[in-house]
Amino acid sequence: MNRKIIAIIPASGIGSRMNAALPKQYLTLQGKTILEHTVAIFLNHPQIDKIVIALSANDQHHQHISLLTSDKIQLVNGGASRAESVFNALQSIDEHSWALVHDAARPCLKRSDLDKLLQITDQNGAILASPVVDTLKRAEGNKISHTEDRTTLWHALTPQFFPTALLKQALQQAFDRQQNVTDEASAMELAGYQPTLITGSNSNLKITRPEDLALAEFYLMHSLEK
């Protein structure tokens, strides 16, 4: 199937839970920023035609990253939320393409997982995800209400992969209805689609708290040694 695949990286957040002087995507691992590690995954993949990165309008840090000057990369202004940043990025790409949305703070994506996801051609799209293995408790305040059945529960990861036109339509519909969407799949679900779950590695963690940095560095070091 001959189709254009555009990677979209929303990177306009500040990562307040990191308690760092810089937005978390500009913290360094193995001598490179988290954003550089993330972008390189797609820059080096032969099936990715273009990368669109949504940055805060006030972001000055990206100017010091030479990797972002590649002809394959386009920078756009992000929005007030992740969904708005993705929507802004979608405006700049061909509606006949497929959009591959990935968190800027997930630098440990495995090439094999990405390759599995890119095989999807179903118009419902697909996401990387991992089955829930922990016992989950529903709470009322700080008290346990009941235990959830985890057998059908998955952790949503990224990338998330959808036809561009359908994703744009789904996000616009969610905005119009003032529905809260925390990822692209939730917008597609609200629009009536059923994305496929593709099992991804647990090493594809999202760096959110300071302790995540050491684990991400371990995974990156391990992948470089192979």
From Swiss-Prot:
Catalyzes the formation of 4-diphosphocytidyl-2-C-methyl-D-erythritol from CTP and 2-C-methyl-D-erythritol 4-phosphate (MEP). This is 2-C-methyl-D-erythritol 4-phosphate cytidylyltransferase. Belongs to the IspD/TarI cytidylyltransferase family. IspD subfamily. Pfam families: IspD. The keyword Nucleotidyltransferase applies. The gene is ispD. It comes from Haemophilus ducreyi (strain 35000HP / ATCC 700724). SUPFAM superfamilies: Nucleotide-diphospho-sugar transferases (SSF53448). One of its GO terms (molecular function) is 2-C-methyl-D-erythritol 4-phosphate cytidylyltransferase activity. Its EC number is 2.7.7.60. The record marks R150, K206 as: Positions MEP for the nucleophilic attack. Pathway: Isoprenoid biosynthesis; isopentenyl diphosphate biosynthesis via DXP pathway; isopentenyl diphosphate from 1-deoxy-D-xylulose 5-phosphate: step 2/6.
